């Protein structure tokens, strides 16, 4: 019920602002949001929130397989309904294992849809990858081979010159 009400409020706000489309980074109970958005007339893309790192609250903890399966179910039920598309999502890159990143990217390619992630939002995210991988976030994803025209990097605030070149070269 809360998700339905939230989606109704969000759709009304988007319409009131004069926009005709949106991309929702994802949450839980997205089936309820999809029903609202499909009936709103808006063009949009939505995702299931996927994270699989240890230490997440029990209410949202899942493994990579379950995370991808949840998006598969959302895709099968709502992709193409009205003006909706379903994208695969890496909710917070630092909360996603390499396995989840690779599985979500593979599935997005199979389904010919987008893979989206919040990227380079704050210095701590960049430091996290520099300390663990000696790579910046986009460099890390590039090393995994998941970047391309099918990838949507939201925010992308703190980019290095090398990351900008990667984005250009991979047509992100």
PLM regions: where:
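Metal-associated gating/positioning segment near the N- to mid-region
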Residues: 1-34
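Short, surface-exposed connector motifs at secondary-structure boundaries
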Residues: 13-21, 82-87, 144-150, 168-172
């Amino acid at each position: 019920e809360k998700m339905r009400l939230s989606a109704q409020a969000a759709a009304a706000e988007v319409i009131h602002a004069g926009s005709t489309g949106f991309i929702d980074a994802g949450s839980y109970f997205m089936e309820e949001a999809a029903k609202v958005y499909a009936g709103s007339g808006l063009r949009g893309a939505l995702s299931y929130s996927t994270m699989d790192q240890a230490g997440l609250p029990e209410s949202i903890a899942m493994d990579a397989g379950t995370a991808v399966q949840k998006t598969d179910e959302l895709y099968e039920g709502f992709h193409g309904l009205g003006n909706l598309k379903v994208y695969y999502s890496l909710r917070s890159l630092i909360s996603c294992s390499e396995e989840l990143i690779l599985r979500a990217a593979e599935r997005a390619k199979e389904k010919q849809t987008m893979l989206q992630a919040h990227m380079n939002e704050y210095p701590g995210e960049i430091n996290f990858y520099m300390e663990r991988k000696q790579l910046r976030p986009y460099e890390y994803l590039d090393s995994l081979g998941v970047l391309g025209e099918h990838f949507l990097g939201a925010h992308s605030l703190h980019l290095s010159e090398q990351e900008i070149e990667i984005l250009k070269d991979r047509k992100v």
